[in-house]
């Protein structure tokens, strides 16, 4: 539903690659921003993946928005087989936080596997009084569509301030 701006309705069906931290609302918001007040134009494309019978390049104004791939069935009818957003639409973000902070992106809690401890020199365990060390962590978000994802952080029940650059303070 390109003209309606509800691209999220087809993201799973056509395997559109977006971050797991993008919600349907955030995807639709980013798509609406990319197409706002711009004419959508469709042109056939010579570049098509294997198993695809026809490909279209979709532009929003002067910028490429996506490629749409079609497959022909036995009755010679075409149906969409895939959609790829242009690489320029994707953004990457880095969030810097402590290991004890709970971080959410667009309302989705960041999974432990997406958090990496920042490299630090080895510290003699005899120098630390506590058995649990709080590490500084880096969270990398790739395949994001939004210009400004909603990042929130908390430690226990206390909300933590989040800077525009993605740094969390506690």
Residues of each region from the PLM?
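Short, aromatic-enriched amphipathic alpha-helices that serve as compact interaction elements
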Residues: 1-6
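Short solvent-exposed beta->alpha transition segments
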Residues: 7-63
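Short beta-strand edge/turn micro-motifs at domain boundaries
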Residues: 57-169
């Amino acid at each position: 539903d390109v003209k309606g701006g509800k691209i999220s309705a087809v993201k799973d069906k056509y395997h559109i690659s977006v971050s797991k931290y993008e919600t349907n609302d955030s995807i639709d918001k980013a798509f609406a921003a990319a197409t706002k007040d711009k004419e959508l134009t469709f042109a056939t494309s010579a570049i098509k993946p294997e198993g695809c019978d026809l490909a279209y390049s979709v532009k929003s104004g002067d910028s490429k928005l996506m490629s749409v791939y079609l497959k022909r069935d036995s009755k010679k009818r075409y149906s969409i087989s895939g959609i790829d957003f242009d690489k320029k639409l994707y953004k990457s973000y880095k969030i810097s936080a402590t290991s004890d902070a709970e971080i959410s992106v667009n309302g989705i809690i960041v999974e432990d596997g997406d958090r990496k401890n920042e490299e630090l020199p080895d510290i003699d365990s005899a120098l630390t009084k506590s058995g649990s060390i709080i590490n500084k962590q880096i969270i990398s978000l790739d395949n994001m569509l939004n210009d400004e994802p909603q990042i929130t952080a908390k430690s226990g029940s206390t909300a933590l301030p989040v800077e525009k650059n993605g740094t969390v303070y506690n």
